Amino acid sequence: MFKIKAGDGSNNLTGKRVAALRREQHLSQRKLAERMQLLGFDVDHYFIRRVENGERFVTDIDLVIFSRALNVPVAELLSAADADL
């Protein structure tokens, strides 16, 4: 089965950006997961790790919840995407 991947073999284009924004805000993966849970998204810190490491595909719903939890526009999560293709 053919799977689309980023140029670096990652399953998403946003994981590195999520990690950078999370670190800029001095949040642990667990704290980011807690923020997402408060928004009604049932995730744990393993979900965050898998996204940041490029192990998990990211849906449009994931992008919206990440943007709300990190208080940034969705476009900010995709800002480095062109370079990774």
Predicted regions: what they are:
Residues 21, 35, 51, 80:
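Residues in the recognition helix of alpha-helical DNA-binding motifs
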Residues 26-50:
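Short alpha-helical DNA-recognition segment
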Residues 23, 34, 68:
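Alpha-helical residues within the helix-turn-helix
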Residues 2-8, 68, 75-85:
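Short, charged recognition helix plus adjacent turn
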Residues 13-16, 27, 43, 58-61:
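Residue-level signal for the short linker/turn that defines the boundary of a DNA-recognition helix
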Residues 55, 59-76:
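DNA major-groove recognition helix of helix-turn-helix/homeodomain DNA-binding modules
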Residues 1-25:
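A short, Lys/Arg-rich alpha-helix, primarily the initiator
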